[in-house]
């Protein structure tokens, strides 16, 4: 450890030569018999046979150099120390600048070596960096490898999602263009000098105070965006769509007051009104049962089934008004009757239109190169191809349905359709797939 600890790219970090007091440059000599403190000599003093007090020129010695591997055969000890110093200077994750400072390794090599030996190998890290914690590190958990986060997302520059996020840069937690982006222009020509009059000095100070107030407004807006989670606009809209239409209208109205209260209080207010709406709807349903003389839920299920049957029969009875429109035209009347007969036989109107028009069904969607494809398994890829849904949208819909199912303890198809407002047939296929694969459960 002493040997490794003496290696550094900065000569001033090493002890000076005992002969000429110059900074030591590798390789240099360490006397094996003198010390402590250690007795170091540069090559010039060693070749002259320098002697000092108890040190004699015939003492045994060691050649101090860092040109040997420690952890990896392709990495020398000097490169190991240079890597640690570069990470300390440039910051973890800034591998391009780390590689530029080292000059001998690429950024991929630096990242791979550092993650392998200093992040994912806690036993070695504790042994090398802190011997006192070696015993405790034997029972320590394995370090978690670094993975980039998906929330907020990191879209490509100038993409549609990047424009939706107003140019937000997640790595810097800042925007490309600030609110009131040209506020600094008012200060570019201001210069405080001793010859300024009192009025001119007060005027300049007033401009600075105005600039400070504009900075405070900029920070206030940033805080509102971050606290309320408004950066990821798509996720925010999905969360809003899980409410019924009446609650969505309230959500839209109360959005302007979100800046006054905190995010937790605002969410509690909306959730409480959503719960109130559900309770009112449930009370109305129970009152309908009581009016009909129903006193148990078993009878209520029979009542709902019969009510649905009556509604369907009522809709069928209105067909008489439709056929009366064609009573004067016999050919049109026969065509309408044939269409109704096909519908009664089990064919949907969409199938009839497709068969009449002769149109072909849309081909499966090609997922090659689409973002998010690598996150899908084979069954999910097949679903996206058949439904013609891009992987990114499918992952957002899946996450929204999973969260709602976990929150409610189950999910109905009607709730899924209210949550993801796309084609109802696509929603049904996604819902059936998630049920079949065990991702969600029916309510």
UniProtKB/Swiss-Prot annotation:
The keyword Mitochondrion does not apply. It holds the Pfam family Myb_DNA-binding. GO terms for biological process: chromatin organization; chromatin remodeling; mitotic cell cycle; regulation of cell cycle; regulation of cell division; regulation of DNA-templated transcription; regulation of embryonic development; regulation of protein stability. Residues 70-122 form the SANT domain. One of its GO terms (molecular function) is DNA binding. It comes from the Eukaryota. Residues 356-443 form the SWIRM domain. Keywords: Chromosome, DNA-binding, Isopeptide bond, Metal-binding, Nucleus, Phosphoprotein, Transcription, Transcription regulation, Ubl conjugation, Zinc, Zinc-finger. PROSITE patterns: SANT, SWIRM, ZF_ZZ_2. Zn(2+) 1 binds at residues 17, 20, 42, 45. InterPro entries: ADA2-like_ZZ (IPR041983), Ada2/TADA2 (IPR016827), Homeodomain-like_sf (IPR009057), Myb_dom (IPR017930), SANT/Myb (IPR001005), SANT_dom (IPR017884), SWIRM (IPR007526), TADA2A_B-like_dom (IPR055141). There is a cross-link at residues 132, 138 (Glycyl lysine isopeptide (Lys-Gly) (interchain with G-Cter in SUMO2)). CDD domains: SANT, ZZ_ADA2. Zn(2+) 2 binds at residues 31, 34, 55, 59. A zinc finger (ZZ-type) spans 12-69. Component of the ATAC complex, a complex with histone acetyltransferase activity on histones H3 and H4. Required for the function of some acidic activation domains, which activate transcription from a distant site. Binds double-stranded DNA. Binds dinucleosomes, probably at the linker region between neighboring nucleosomes. Plays a role in chromatin remodeling. May promote TP53/p53 'Lys-321' acetylation, leading to reduced TP53 stability and transcriptional activity. May also promote XRCC6 acetylation thus facilitating cell apoptosis in response to DNA damage. PANTHER family: TRANSCRIPTIONAL ADAPTER 2-ALPHA, TRANSCRIPTIONAL ADAPTOR 2 ADA2 -RELATED. Interacts with GCN5 and NR3C1. Associated with the P/CAF protein in the PCAF complex. Component of the PCAF complex, at least composed of TADA2L/ADA2, TADA3L/ADA3, TAF5L/PAF65-beta, TAF6L/PAF65-alpha, TAF10/TAFII30, TAF12/TAFII20, TAF9/TAFII31 and TRRAP. Component of the ADA2A-containing complex (ATAC), composed of KAT14, KAT2A, TADA2L, TADA3L, ZZ3, MBIP, WDR5, YEATS2, CCDC101 and DR1. Interacts with CCDC134. This is Transcriptional adapter 2-alpha. The gene is Tada2a.
